[in-house]
Swiss-Prot record:
Primary localisation category: plastid
Cystine bridges: C90-C93
Protein name: Glutaredoxin-C5, chloroplastic
Domain of life (superkingdom): Eukaryota
Organismal lineage: Eukaryota, Viridiplantae, Streptophyta, Embryophyta, Tracheophyta
Effect after changing C93S: Loss of Fe-S cluster incorporation, but increased glutaredoxin activity
Reported impact of C141S: No effect on Fe-S cluster incorporation or on glutaredoxin activity
Family per record: Belongs to the glutaredoxin family. CPYC subfamily.
Induction of synthesis: Up-regulated by cold treatment.
GO biological process terms held by the UniProt record: iron-sulfur cluster assembly
Keyword Acetylation among record annotations: yes
Protein source organism: Arabidopsis thaliana
GO cellular component annotations of the record: chloroplast
Entry's localization field: Plastid, Chloroplast
């Protein structure tokens, strides 16, 4: 197992053979963190932009596969200061990861292309939650800030560092 400069989130499945539909309730999964030294975002009231489900099948059963994925995403982005949903081969993802490294921030990176069949499913749920179908999909303190272009713009304006400083200040108060 190669060690990278970024922590990754691994998805472990139980009894997932073919890729099921997102709303199938007979499948389950669990998220396992691998070395997560991040400060937790104390702002529990942070909301992720467009966090509504457009799928009536997924919202009709709270125990459905898609609903559990949505819940896991929400939990992940609110419990970690910076989360990047990425793909290892994507140059835009690399640019965003490098930007946070330059800022002295070690984000939680979820490499969707290394999650097997759950990667595309997770990306579909992210699209439903955020309206964004591309990677990187970046969250700061539970708030969806967008992709590479959005993140770079926030950094150029100085807003990204302000968001990170605010998050660190709140984490330091505990």
């Amino acid at each position: 197992m190669a060690v990278t400069a970024f922590n990754t989130l691994k998805l472990v499945s139980s009894s997932l053979d073919p890729i099921p539909s997102v709303s199938c309730s007979s499948y389950s999964f669990s998220l396992i963190y691998v070395g997560s030294p991040y400060k937790r975002c104390l702002k529990q009231s942070c909301s992720v932009r467009a966090m509504t489900s457009s799928s009536s099948a997924a919202s009709s059963s709270s125990s459905s596969f898609g609903s559990r994925m949505e819940e896991s995403i929400r939990k992940t982005v609110t419990e970690n200061t910076v989360v990047i949903y990425s793909k290892t081969w994507c140059s835009y993802c690399t640019e965003v990861k490098t930007l946070f490294k330059r800022l002295g921030v070690q984000p939680l990176v979820v490499e969707l292309d290394q999650l097997g069949p759950q990667g595309p499913q997770l990306q579909k749920v992210l699209e439903r939650l955020t309206g964004q179908h591309t990677v990187p999909n970046v969250f700061v303190c539970g708030k969806h800030i967008g992709g590479c272009t959005d993140t770079v713009k926030l950094n150029r304006k100085g807003d990204l560092e302000l968001m990170l400083a605010e998050a660190n200040g709140k984490n330091g108060q505990s």
